[in-house]
C-alpha cells in the first residue's frame, strides 16, 4: 500500500500541528536575524505569484551560495515556513536562497524542476562562489534531479555546484503512481521515470549525501539508500 507508505503525518503524534510551528519559528527567526543579516524576501524570478525566492545574505562577501528547496510533496508549503533553517549557513558566511514554486495540480512535477532551476540561476547571478544544493522530501528529489542527465539547470550554473544534500528525498517516483496523491500530482509512467534521479546518469562531479531519520518509515529509508 504505497498510499500508506508515504503518509507521514498520521504516524507522527500531533503531526498536523507542525506546519504552524514551523511558520512561527521561521517568522521569529526572521525578526531576530533582521539586525544581523540582509533578508530579501520574495525576489521574483518568473511571472507567477509563486515564482519567487527568499535570499539571506551575511555580512561582507558571501563564501558561496546555499540553496534549500522545501518539501510538501510538490503540493503544499512555501519558503516562509523554513527561514530559520538558513541560520547555520548564513552565520558561517554563506548566502542562502530558498525558492518557491507553483504547486501541483496547477503544474506538473517536471515544470517544478524547471522553475527551481530558474530560481537557482537567478540567485547564482547575484552570488559568486560555489553552490551547495539541499532539499527536503520533494525538495530532495528536485535538487538531485537537477544534477542528473537532462537537467534544465544551465551548464554554467551546474559547473559551480560543489555538493548536493537530499534530506528524506524521493529519488524514485514510480511508486507514487500507485498513491492517492497522484490524483493531484498527475504523474504518468514516462514523467515518473524522467524525474527519478536514481534512473538517470549524474551530471558533472559533486559531493552527494542523502540523509533520513533513523526512525523514519521504511520507504523513506529505502529511497535514501537508492542513491
Task: Describe the residue ranges of each PLM region.
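Short hydrophobic segments within beta-strands
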Residues: 56, 68-69, 134, 167, ...
